[in-house]
Structure formats: C-alpha cells, structure tokens
Amino acid sequence: MSDTADRVKKIVVEHLGVEADKVTEEASFIDDLGADSLDIVELVMAFEEEFGVEIPDDAAEKISTVSDAIKYIDENKG
C-alpha cells in the first residue's frame, strides 16, 4: 500500500470514526462508511491540508470512494 493510501485511510478513520479495517480502497464514503455531505466536505479539506493539493468542487463531487481520493491526490500532488 502506498504512503498516500495509508495517509488517506488514517484521515478517514480520524474524521469518520470508523474502524481501520472498514476503510478499504473500494469503500464508498457515503454507502459503506456512513459519511454525510458535511463529512465529505471535511474530508476534502483534510486531504487538501495533508497533501498540499487543491481539490475543486467539481473534482470533489467525483470522489466517492477511498480509491477515488487516493487516485486524485496521486495525480495532483506536487
């Protein structure tokens, strides 16, 4: 597992209060991890801060799974 994946999963566990073993790359933030729209906004902000990337609203709307977040961050981080 990549460093990005580990860090994304850690943020998800901290922000959503879910068990780490539930945070798989295929997990949907809403359907599998119980996030609501406010949680998603907070996760996106945490990803931006942690990785120094900007995630515009149109891109954030397409990030629905853990792997979506990892892929976006890997493709856009400095």
Curated annotation (Swiss-Prot):
Post-translational modification comment from the UniProt entry: 4'-phosphopantetheine is transferred from CoA to a specific serine of apo-ACP by AcpS. This modification is essential for activity because fatty acids are bound in thioester linkage to the sulfhydryl of the prosthetic group.
Pfam families linked: PP-binding (PF00550)
Subcellular location as annotated: Cytoplasm
SUPFAM superfamilies in alphabetical order: ACP-like (SSF47336)
Modified residues (O-(pantetheine 4'-phosphoryl)serine): 37
Key words, A-Z: Cytoplasm, Fatty acid biosynthesis, Fatty acid metabolism, Lipid biosynthesis, Lipid metabolism, Phosphopantetheine, Phosphoprotein
A GO MF term: acyl carrier activity
GO biological process, one term: lipid A biosynthetic process
Domain (Carrier): residue spans on this chain: 2-77
Claim: Zinc is one of the keywords in the record: no
Assigned GO CC terms: cytosol; membrane
UniProt pathway annotation: Lipid metabolism; fatty acid biosynthesis
UniProt similarity note: Belongs to the acyl carrier protein (ACP) family.
Function: Carrier of the growing fatty acid chain in fatty acid biosynthesis.
Protein's name in the database: Acyl carrier protein
